[in-house]
Structure formats: structure tokens, C-alpha cells
């Protein structure tokens, strides 16, 4: 029976291709939802979120199978993961620690006692016949996340700031399910540790929903709790929507921020239309298919999960000081970092500051570089020059190739920008030291300049002097001397003028 559900790579790929095709055909409908939407004053919008977040652990929540996201289907499963009789769970302490980090970061009250419960239902992606979760005694309660000027939403002017704060009802630690591809299942995901973050229905606008999700992504990435990616399923969002305090409707299967927005808009319009026609709304669970929400089940046929405590797992008993100890061990918060990086002396663009926060290694690099090169253009050197050099060569940023103190030395050298770019490119491409790059490119006085260097300089000048190039190619060949003069100036006479003249004529195809 189990083998019938095991996935293969070929089947998974075919399913993914079909999904992509369906998504493309839905594009026009999504755009229509977006352009025609508006809130109606007489129909009050209320929304809450349930965010399922995969924790970045080495092993699964209750087994020693490694966590896997892109490996061959069913290559990381244990007997316990597929529910074979006689197997028992053992809690992964790393997962508990990451869940506690999230609870503290979200200002929650960590519970001294929590425990696991069994949530019973039958579905092929849950081979045990139940999910281990925390229904009765969750790990943490009563948290909040507050918006500020960095979140792109209108800040409340009331003294209590209530409209700026989204309350968090609870955080529970639980196991993920397998992943279904049509009629087959990949159990690599089964048992991966999750936290479910449940908010209160405090959202009164779509902008705040979107801002909260992005702020949450930034937070879990910065504290290295989760990769924070919606597209890969590392974060999955269920949205609860109601109008005029009617019974809530839960929308499942939302995998991108764009789909979150469109699903809310569609569901709000559906509920408003029902009420304007004199109908009534009922509690429902609906699925989002990329175009509309579809009924999955109503209150009348809701699943009775028959929760009860898991007798194979002991209670989690924590020290009263655990929250304080974790809080003091966490790095500077994202909000504090944003405030510091966007103000003097850094004055970073907000987008660049957020980028640094999601990449701890890059943040450390920038701060080490800035400690040496304390100038307003530090931002430009890191983002426009250093990272661009890696990106253009199709390489992942690696601090060992160009260390911050070495980069600061290169930036301070008495060379023009083109020369510094050429040296940086050579270092990244060939993974050589600064001194070696300077020697190989011929920047030392006792070394002969290379043709490669002269060619790159000519290409750079051609790209930045399009009007002169157009004039040359329209028949005014003598205008090439303007380019030669620019090249001589940039290289401070390091090359013979005839070298540049010949290269420009060759690259521009003139005689």
C-alpha cells in the first residue's frame, strides 16, 4: 500500500510542469481581481493569519532522518516517518530551540509547560493517521509584532498604538506532512519540524497583511530560524477572512505574496456579493486555485480531529528564565538594525539595509568593511561593485575570495574606477589575491600592461560614450581620437595611444 504512494522524480516534474501551465493561464484573471477591487465602507473587513514555518534543523522533529527539500523523493525517510508499527518519536532539541527563538522574537509568553497532542485524520500524505501538534498546551502564547516606519504601512496616530500592533494568539510546534504529487507521495517532508504562528484577527487592510508577512520573513531569516521562502513551501500561509463579523472563512493553499493578496480580494468580494443578495455566510474552509476560492468543507462536514495527548512524548518543562536567556543571546533585532543602518553614518537605502539583515554573513562583511572605509560611498562599493562583480560572473558571494580588509585596500588605491573594477573582476574570476591580480593585470610599474586589460578598458569606454560611437560609425572616423584620449586619461598613460587606437578600430569594425 505504501509503495503505491511513493513519488518518483519524473512524476513530480510532470506535476510541476502542469501546475506552471495552469498558473500562466490564470494570469489574466488575477490582474482583473487586482484592478477591480475596492473595500466597501458598509462591509467591514477582518482578517487573521496562520503561518506554517519550516525550521532550519539538520534532522526531523521526531526522527534522525535528515531534513531535505530538493533531494530525490523518498530518500530521507525513516520507519517512524512513514508510520510503521513499533516506532517511537524522540524530540529534536534543535527544533525546540529554534521554536523558542521565534517565540521570543515575536514577544510571546513562553509556557513553562507544553505538550504534544495527536490530531487524527486520514490522508495519504500523513501515513501515521495523525499529526503530532500542540493543540491544548502550545509552546508560547500572547505575542505581538508592531509595525513601524520601515514596513510601508500607515502608522496609527492613536496614543496606545493599537492599530500598529498585530497580536499573536499562540505558537505551536508540530510536524510537517508529506508532499502529494497527483496520486503519488514524497515523504521527505514528512516529519520536518514546523511552527504554526496564529495571529488574532487584527488586520483591517490587505496592506497590513502583506507588510506582516514580509516583516515575519525578515525576522525568521535574520535569526536563522527558517529560509523564509514562500515559493518553496518553507513558509505557508492560511488566511482567515470575514465580513461584518460573519463566521470566518479559512483559505488554504496560498504559496506567494501575490496569491495572498488576490485570494483575500476574491474572498472579500465573494462574501460581500453573498450578503448584498440577501444570503448568509457560514464557517468554511476553502482552497485557493490561483483564480478563485473553492469550497473544501463547511461547518456541517468539518473534520472531528479527536485531539488527545500523545502518550509517547513527555511534557516539555522549561526553566522560568529560558525566555530571558534566549533573548539575551539573540543578535540585534531587525527593527533596531534598520534604524541604525538607514541613519548616519551609514545612510543606507532601505532595500539595501533589508538585504543585509537577511544575509548575516553579508551584514558582517559590510560592517567590517565600513569600519575601515568610513565613507558615504561604502554602500555603493559593496552593492554596486562587489556584489555585482560576483553576480556578473555567476558566482555566489564568498568572503574568502575578497576579504573586507582587502577590499577596503583596493578601494583606497590611487587608481581609477575602471582599473579597480578590472582588478576586482580578476580576483573574483580567478580567486587570486589582490597583489597577484595587480601583478597579472600589469598594474605594477615594472610589469608590461596586458592586452586583456586594454581590451576591457576599450569596451567600458565604448559602452559609456554611445554618442561618439554613433558618430564614428556614421563615417567620422577621426572621432575615435576622443575615445583614445579618454582611455589614456583613465589609465594615466600606462598604455601607448596606438594600442587603444587599434583596439577601438577593431572593436568598432572600422579601418
Swiss-Prot record:
Keywords: ATP-binding, Ligase, Mitochondrion, Nucleotide-binding, Protein biosynthesis, Transit peptide. NCBIfam families: gatB, PRK05477.1-2. Pfam families: GatB_N, GatB_Yqey. The lineage of its organism: Eukaryota, Fungi, Dikarya, Ascomycota, Saccharomycotina. Gene3D superfamilies: 1.10.10.410. It is found in: Mitochondrion. It comes from Lodderomyces elongisporus (strain ATCC 11503 / CBS 2605 / JCM 1781 / NBRC 1676 / NRRL YB-4239) (Yeast). One of its GO terms (biological process) is mitochondrial translation. This is Glutamyl-tRNA(Gln) amidotransferase subunit B, mitochondrial. Its main location: mitochondrion. Belongs to the GatB/GatE family. GatB subfamily. Its EC number is 6.3.5.-. It catalyses: L-glutamyl-tRNA(Gln) + L-glutamine + ATP + H2O = L-glutaminyl-tRNA(Gln) + L-glutamate + ADP + phosphate + H(+). Allows the formation of correctly charged Gln-tRNA(Gln) through the transamidation of misacylated Glu-tRNA(Gln) in the mitochondria. The reaction takes place in the presence of glutamine and ATP through an activated gamma-phospho-Glu-tRNA(Gln). GO terms for molecular function: ATP binding; glutaminyl-tRNA synthase (glutamine-hydrolyzing) activity. Subunit of the heterotrimeric GatFAB amidotransferase (AdT) complex, composed of A, B and F subunits. InterPro entries: Asn/Gln-tRNA_amidoTrfase_suB/E, Asn/Gln-tRNA_Trfase_suB/E_cat, Asn/Gln_amidotransferase, GatB, GatB_Yqey_C_2, Gln-tRNA_amidoTrfase_suB_CS, Gln_synth/guanido_kin_cat_dom. Residues 1-6 form a transit peptide. One of its GO terms (cellular component) is glutamyl-tRNA(Gln) amidotransferase complex.
Amino acid at each position: 500500500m505504501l509503495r503505491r504512494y511513493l513519488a518518483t522524480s519524473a512524476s513530480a516534474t510532470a506535476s510541476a510542469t502542469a501546475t506552471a501551465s495552469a498558473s500562466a493561464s490564470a494570469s489574466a484573471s488575477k490582474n482583473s481581481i487586482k484592478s477591480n477591487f475596492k473595500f466597501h465602507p458598509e462591509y467591514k473587513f477582518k482578517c487573521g493569519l496562520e503561518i506554517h514555518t519550516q525550521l532550519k534543523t539538520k534532522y526531523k522533529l521526531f526522527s534522525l532522518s535528515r531534513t531535505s527539500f530538493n533531494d530525490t523523493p523518498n530518500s530521507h525517510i525513516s520507519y517512524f516517518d512513514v508510520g510503521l508499527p513499533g516506532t517511537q518519536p524522540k524530540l529534536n532539541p534543535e527544533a525546540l530551540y529554534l521554536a523558542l527563538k521565534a517565540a521570543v522574537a515575536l514577544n510571546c509568553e513562553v509556557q513553562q509547560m507544553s505538550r504534544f497532542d495527536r490530531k487524527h485524520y486520514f490522508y495519504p500524505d500523513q501515513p501515521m493517521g495523525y499529526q503530532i501538534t500542540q493543540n491544548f498546551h502550545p509552546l508560547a502564547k500572547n505575542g505581538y509584532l508592531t509595525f513601524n516606519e520601515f514596513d510601508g504601512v500607515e502608522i496609527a496616530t492613536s496614543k496606545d498604538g493599537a492599530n500598529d500592533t498585530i497580536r499573536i494568539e499562540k505558537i505551536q510546534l508540530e510536524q510537517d506532512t508529506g508532499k502529494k504529487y497527483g496520486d503519488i507521495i514524497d515523504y521527505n517532508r514528512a516529519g520536518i519540524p514546523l511552527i504554526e504562528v496564529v495571529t488574532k484577527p487584527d488586520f483591517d487592510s490587505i496592506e497590513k497583511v502583506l507588510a506582516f508577512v514580509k516583516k515575519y520573513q525578515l525576522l525568521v531569516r535574520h535569526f536563522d530560524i527558517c529560509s523564509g521562502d514562500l515559493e518553496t513551501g518553507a513558509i505557508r500561509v492560511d488566511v482567515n477572512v470575514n465580513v461584518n463579523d460573519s463566521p470566518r472563512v479559512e483559505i488554504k493553499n496560498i504559496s506567494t505574496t501575490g496569491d495572498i493578496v488576490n485570494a483575500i480580494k476574491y474572498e472579500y468580494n465573494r462574501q460581500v456579493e453573498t450578503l448584498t443578495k440577501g444570503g448568509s455566510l457560514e464557517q468554511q474552509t476553502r482552497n485557493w486555485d490561483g483564480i478563485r476560492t473553492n469550497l473544501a468543507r463547511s461547518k456541517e462536514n468539518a473534520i472531528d480531529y479527536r485531539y488527545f495527548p500523545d502518550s509517547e512524548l513527555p511534557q516539555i518543562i522549561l526553566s522560568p528564565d529560558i525566555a530571558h536567556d534566549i533573548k539575551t543571546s539573540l543578535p540585534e533585532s531587525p527593527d533596531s538594525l534598520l534604524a541604525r543602518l538607514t541613519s548616519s553614518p551609514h545612510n543606507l537605502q532601505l532595500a539595501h539595509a533589508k538585504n543585509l539583515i537577511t544575509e548575516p554573513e553579508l551584514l558582517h562583511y559590510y560592517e567590517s568593511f565600513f569600519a575601515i572605509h568610513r565613507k558615504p560611498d561604502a554602500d555603493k562599493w559593496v552593492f554596486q561593485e562587489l556584489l555585482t562583480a560576483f553576480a556578473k560572473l555567476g558566482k555566489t558571494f564568498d568572503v574568502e575570495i575578497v576579504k573586507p580588509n582587502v577590499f577596503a585596500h583596493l578601494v583606497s588605491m590611487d587608481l581609477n574606477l575602471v582599473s579597480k573594477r578590472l582588478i576586482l573582476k580578476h580576483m573574483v574570476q580567478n580567486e587570486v589575491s589582490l597583489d597577484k591580480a595587480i601583478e597579472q593585470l600589469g598594474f605594477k610599474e615594472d610589469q608590461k600592461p596586458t592586452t586583456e586589460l586594454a581590451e576591457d578598458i576599450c569596451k567600458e569606454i565604448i559602452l559609456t560614450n554611445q554618442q561618439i560611437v554613433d558618430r564614428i560609425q556614421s563615417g567620422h572616423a577621426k572621432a575615435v581620437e576622443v575615445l583614445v584620449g579618454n582611455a589614456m586619461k583613465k589609465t594615466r598613460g600606462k598604455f601607448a595611444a596606438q594600442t587603444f587606437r587599434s583596439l577601438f578600430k577593431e572593436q568598432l569594425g572600422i579601418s
